[in-house]
UniProtKB/Swiss-Prot annotation:
Substrate binds at residues 38, 60-62, 92-101, 218, 236. Pathway: Pyrimidine metabolism; UMP biosynthesis via de novo pathway; UMP from orotate: step 2/2. This is Orotidine 5'-phosphate decarboxylase. PANTHER family: OROTIDINE 5'-PHOSPHATE DECARBOXYLASE. One of its GO terms (molecular function) is orotidine-5'-phosphate decarboxylase activity. Belongs to the OMP decarboxylase family. Coiled coil: none annotated. Its EC number is 4.1.1.23. The gene is URA3. InterPro entries: Aldolase_TIM (IPR013785), OMPdecase (IPR014732), OMPdecase_AS (IPR018089), OMPdeCOase_dom (IPR001754), RibuloseP-bd_barrel (IPR011060). The lineage of its organism: Eukaryota, Fungi, Dikarya, Ascomycota, Saccharomycotina. GO terms for biological process: 'de novo' pyrimidine nucleobase biosynthetic process; 'de novo' UMP biosynthetic process.
């Protein structure tokens, strides 16, 4: 059953401080838009985020595709923009290894993801140890609250993430109510009758295009929100093909918010 509760109501009862903060932020900014900023230079990355910042609740990064990455040059100004525009950060790392390995991938190396990203995500393919490893890494490296999304479903054509795989991933999520805050999925993932209130974030959302020729399949904002999506993830629809990120940011923010108001009967 799709939740018709408001973000504020959900914030008041959610066990995760990360989810609480995100719900309050979305309500304050009247925005449930996550900008997926996949570009290869720090300057373009920061410039786009600065333009999109007023319209988003979350920025989604693939930090390892930035050619000139440095912590001081890329992450420090990203955190400044997050404070300036009041949005949270989601590193789309898609962890998929044993617990000890993902712990080090999350906390160490060049990127030190746990030190700056509010939210990250993981596949369920290696079992529940991936959750334990990431949670341990967060607790050992930062005093800031962190949250994890499990990859239950994907938007790409031919994805193997469906059926029993999705069901098993949901079972893994149930093992940690505070650290696992929700899913990357195409619809509501249930759990309400067991006391879970998972945040559903959905990629592959577009107001104009139906696909990209490389397997991506787009669904409309109204379509995904009406079936349980809480946060719409949009990338090239905001800045690709000569689009103006400020114009498109406002357009998608308004579309997402209006769909949320419709779902919650406001």
């Amino acid at each position: 059953m799709v939740s018709t509760k408001t973000y504020t109501t959900r914030a008041s009862t959610h066990p995760s401080p990360v989810a609480q903060r995100l719900f309050h932020l979305m309500d304050t900014k009247k925005a449930n838009l996550c900008a997926s900023v996949d570009v290869q230079t720090t300057s373009e990355f920061l410039s786009l985020i600065d333009k999109l910042g007023p319209y988003i609740c979350l920025v989604k990064t693939h930090i390892d595709i930035i050619d000139d990455f440095s912590y001081e040059g890329t992450i420090v100004p990203l955190l400044e923009l997050a404070r300036k525009h009041n949005f949270m950060i989601f590193e789309d790392r898609k962890f998929a290894d044993i617990g000890n390995t993902v712990k080090h991938q999350y906390t160490s190396g060049v990127y030190k993801i746990s030190s700056w990203s509010d939210i990250t995500n993981a596949h369920g393919v290696t079992g529940a140890g991936v959750v334990d490893g990431l949670k341990q890494g967060a607790l050992e490296t930062t005093k800031e609250p962190r949250g994890l999304l499990m990859l239950a479903e994907l938007s790409s054509k031919g994805s193997l993430a469906y059926g029993e795989y999705t069901e098993k991933t949901v079972e893994i999520a149930k093992l940690d109510k505070e650290f696992v805050i929700g899913f990357i999925a195409q619809r509501d993932m249930g759990g309400h009758d067991e006391g879970f209130d998972w945040i559903v974030m959905t990629p592959g959302v577009g107001l104009d295009d139906k696909g990209d020729g490389l397997g991506q399949q787009y669904r409309t904002v109204d379509e995904v929100v009406s079936t349980g999506t809480d946060v719409i993830i949009v990338g090239r629809g905001l800045f690709g093909k000569g689009r103006d990120p400020e114009v498109e940011g406002k357009r998608y923010r308004d579309a997402g918010w209006n769909a949320y108001l419709k779902r919650t009967g406001q």
